[in-house]
Amino acid sequence: MSKVGTSDSKNTLYCSFCGKSQHEVRKLIAGPTVFICDECVELCMDIIREENKSSLVKSRDGIPTPKEICKVLDDYVIGQSHAKKVLSVAVHNHYKRLNHQTKHNDVELAKSNILLIGPTGSGKTLLAQTLARILDVPFTMADATTLTEAGYVGEDVENIILKLLQAADYNVERAQRGIVYIDEIDKISRKSDNPSITRDVSGEGVQQALLKIMEGTVASVPPQGGRKHPQQEFLQVDTTNILFICGGAFAGLEKIISARGRSTSIGFGAQVLAPEDRRTGEIFRHVEPEDLLKYGLIPEFVGRLPVVATLEDLDETSLKKILTEPKNALVKQYQRLFEMENIELTFADEALGAVARKAIERKTGARGLRSILEAILLETMFDLPGLEGVEEVVISREVVEGTARPLYIYADRSDRAVENASA
């Protein structure tokens, strides 16, 4: 509402919610008898987003069903149906176990931590990030490559629980019901077959340190980080009900699996796993605990990851879908960028196929798609802000292959469009 002050400010308008004047805010929106500023509008939008997020996949008893979780994952992640099912069931069981563990004390339900194995760019991290977006439990991600044993330069294992505690706003009860995703878990494999050669503080030592918190223990967590503030009071966090999901590319594991297949194949009808003839994701389906042991994981660590989900290589069809179908698809992102210049960006179907083939050749999976599109659109994004009259840019297969330039279509339909398309 408008408030009247002194004679020099009698026409000054104020926000009816926070009381700030029109000079203190960027925008002041008028209603019949009230005013609201842009800051209050943004605050209201944040409140609505949080409510929508928490009610996204709720079902009876507040437990999201596996199908509901999987359906939301489908909106953001293309393919990997098996891994989605494993994650959806594990998360559903995690909720169900926590909600019903006090009702039947005769049978104690143990948690099942998950190991995700898949080639680079197959969607392991994206699956975890999407879970973080849709689940109403504290969630944190950790990078195994930064972890070391306590007392050495690097992050302590307890820092993972500290991050989860921070995600729960230091609410210990909520943190004890959370989910932790540890990425690059293959990078902490044992560096040598002989464990007594030297102390492996970033490999086997980290595996040993992770054992207790993954199985369940009461961890002493320093709220401000233990190394810089040694005198602070520690918080006690029980990790028994925290679900751990570990993911890694496990480069070279396919050779170990194939070697085992050759050594155990006897007779004319035996199947031989040949890495040169089969995709990495297909070979990962045959992984056994003994293969993980040979790779460098210690037996106790493998035993604490009873559920193993493997992700497949992404083929050309899947990569084309990744470019266009998810809600935050790369093509949609670049089209939005061009819309800011009032220009329509169009990709020919053959162009999307060429982009997918380039990613397959580079063996970078979906992670390499953005760098390919950046290289293709670099000159266009450099030129367009200085050009007038362009209403559409068309990317063809020849543009992706580097034999032609993008086609510029002008509003006046002049011959300049053809000139821009020439190599």
Curated annotation (Swiss-Prot):
Keywords: ATP-binding, Chaperone, Metal-binding, Nucleotide-binding, Zinc. SUPFAM superfamilies: Glucocorticoid receptor-like (DNA-binding domain) (SSF57716), P-loop containing nucleoside triphosphate hydrolases (SSF52540). GO terms for biological process: cell division; proteolysis involved in protein catabolic process. PROSITE patterns: CLPX_ZB. SMART domains: AAA, ClpB_D2-small, zf-C4_ClpX. Zn(2+) binds at residues 15, 18, 37, 40. Signal peptide: none annotated. ATP-dependent specificity component of the Clp protease. It directs the protease to specific substrates. Can perform chaperone functions in the absence of ClpP. PANTHER family: ATP-DEPENDENT CLP PROTEASE ATP-BINDING SUBUNIT CLPX-LIKE, MITOCHONDRIAL, ATP-DEPENDENT CLP PROTEASE ATP-BINDING SUBUNIT CLPX-LIKE, MITOCHONDRIAL-RELATED. Component of the ClpX-ClpP complex. Forms a hexameric ring that, in the presence of ATP, binds to fourteen ClpP subunits assembled into a disk-like structure with a central cavity, resembling the structure of eukaryotic proteasomes. Belongs to the ClpX chaperone family. This is ATP-dependent Clp protease ATP-binding subunit ClpX. It comes from Bradyrhizobium diazoefficiens (strain JCM 10833 / BCRC 13528 / IAM 13628 / NBRC 14792 / USDA 110).
